[in-house]
Amino acid sequence: MQVPGFAQAPAALPSKMYRYDDLPVKASGTGPNKSRAILDGKTHTGFRIEIHESELGAGLAPHPPHTHVHEELMLVREGTMEITIKGVVEKLGPGSVAFVASNEEHGWRNVGSTRAVYTVITLRG
């Protein structure tokens, strides 16, 4: 039942399969960068989750180092990424994962000679 004057809360994300070829592709900035939105919404337990995959051209970064309240997981699928978290720099390759806690300065860039492909999972309380 909806109470007059109150917005109805959005429905929780349903269980679903996501086929890679069906994901919408969006150009991201200039050059070869692009991203694929996978999902964005609230889970049944109340957490907001957003997942996207990005392709980044050799030598490029998606944006300057920054901070934000939400937390992120970054999973490298292809290429070599240089990840900086709180001033600590490491190179990560396929299968590697980085976790960025709330309000910690971070950034990443493709330091390889070919494209890098990675997935970002954003977690909001």
Label the model's feature ranges:
Residues V69-M81, K86:
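Glycine- and acidic-residue-biased ligand/ion/polar-headgroup-sensing regions
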Residues Q2-R48:
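A short, N-terminal "cap"/entry segment at the start of jelly-roll beta-barrel domains
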Residues S102-G125:
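Ligand-binding loop in jelly-roll beta-barrel domains
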Residues K42-I49, V69, T84, E104, ...:
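Mature, secreted membrane-active peptide modules
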Residues E50-H68, S102:
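Conserved short histidine dyad/triad with adjacent acidic residue
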Residues V88-N103:
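Short acidic-glycine-tyrosine-enriched beta hairpin
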Residues I51-E55, L73, V97-F99, V120:
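Conserved hydrophobic/aromatic beta-strand scaffold that supports enzyme active sites
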